[in-house]
Amino acid sequence: MMNTPVSGLVPFPAPQEAALHPQAVQVRADQPADPRAMLGAFEQLLGEFALDGYAAGAGVESAEVAEPIALVVGTSGSTGTPKRTALTARALAASAAATENFFDSNSNAASQWLLALPAHYIAGAQVLARSVLAGTAPVIARSVTEPVHFSPEVFLQAVERMSSARRFISLVPTQLHKLLESADANPSLGAEIHEALGSFTGILLG
């Protein structure tokens, strides 16, 4: 159980402290967060939505009353006034359900995610939340937890560690461009990259 924010309180005025769930995960863009610690917090926050039913959208309808905030992602404010994005556990579950339903297949395999984005970014945090909701352990690329850059080698190493046939990854355009550019420059490596990319049930890009 985690009773304190993962990366310290985001020093912005909103959302108000009273609206935060006791286990709320709070991160900001200029402070890297520990994805494993975040997983532990999400397990507490998302327990009622996990596993059975969430992929079909069960239990994630809009609530009529205000719910505690589960995730707060703050910007660094480098281009202006710092802002905060706040999501409830129900909102995280609804997002995960939408992804599952969009990539619906006949596979009985559980969904497994590869985390290739920083956990303190909203897309990275959502990968962790979706993993908890799916009841599977995400594979975390070395570039997320170690002082190495995302590269084709790091990507391929992470893909090799995946165990489910139903697999997902979230990337930003520059990451995908790097993979495809490397594939074009090195045919031997390119075959591995294309095979790895083709093994994913879904690739979220944004």
Predicted regions mapped to residue ranges:
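Conserved ATP-dependent adenylate/AMP-binding module captured primarily in the ANL superfamily
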Residues: 2-49, 93-114, 148-165
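Conserved S/T- and glycine-rich ATP-binding loop of Class I adenylate-forming
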Residues: 75-78, 113, 128, 169, ...
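Conserved AMP-binding A3 loop
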Residues: 68-97, 104
